[in-house]
């Protein structure tokens, strides 16, 4: 199975990435995590992106806040799928990062999830890999089924609590 590359702009993004890591682990998807900055370590970020396919990666998740150029910088240097996680900061509640991540020029796509959307970034990568992996596909089907069962259980609990 291809692995997922996870790149965050700084260690302040780790709480968001932890959810991504937990989701990938639960789906038994291998991954690596790195800190590269589009502004402070552009050469390292570029080198990682350019060699990602040869190093066994199937997709790359990038998490960054504020100017959030990381996903775009990575996408400019690879043809692998890049998923951007705009991270909330104390300035503009992450809207600046969302706009920086989602507004890419034609020809250099970045799939963008919600602000702090680490779980959905992992699930999107899993869906990409599951196109050619039946076992992973089944784990995703099972995960969705479990989610539906949890909602129905809560529905019954609320009805019971309200005496309905």
Q: Could you say what each language-model-derived stretch is?
A:
Residues 91-138:
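Short, glycine-/small-residue-rich phosphate/pyrophosphate-handling segment
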Residues 21, 46-49, 76, 93-105:
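Active-site-proximal loop->helix
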Residues 33-54:
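N-terminal beta-loop-helix "entrance" segment that forms/cooperates
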Residues 2-40:
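Glycine-rich phosphate/diphosphate-binding loop of Rossmann-like nucleotide-binding domains
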Residues 129-164:
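Glycine-rich phosphate/pyrophosphate-binding loop and the adjoining helix
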Residues 13-17, 41-45, 64-73, 92-95, ...:
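Short glycine/serine/threonine-rich phosphate/pyrophosphate-binding segments
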Residues 48-86:
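Glycine-rich phosphate-binding loop
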């Amino acid at each position: 199975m291809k692995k997922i590359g996870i790149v965050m702009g700084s260690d302040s993004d780790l709480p968001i990435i932890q959810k991504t890591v937990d989701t990938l682990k639960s789906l038994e998807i291998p991954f690596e995590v790195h800190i590269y900055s589009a502004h402070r370590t552009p050469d390292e970020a570029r080198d990682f992106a350019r060699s990602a396919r040869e190093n066994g990666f199937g997709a790359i998740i990038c998490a960054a806040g504020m100017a959030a150029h990381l996903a775009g910088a990575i996408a400019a240097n690879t043809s692998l799928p890049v998923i951007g996680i705009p991270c909330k900061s104390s300035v503009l509640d992450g809207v600046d990062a969302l706009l920086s991540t989602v507004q890419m020029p034609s020809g250099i796509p970045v799939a963008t999830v919600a602000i702090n959307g680490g779980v959905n970034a992992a699930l999107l990568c899993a869906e990409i890999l599951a196109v050619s992996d039946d076992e992973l596909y089944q784990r995703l089907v099972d995960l969705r089924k479990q989610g539906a069962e949890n909602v129905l259980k809560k529905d019954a609990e609320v009805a019971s609590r309200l005496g309905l």
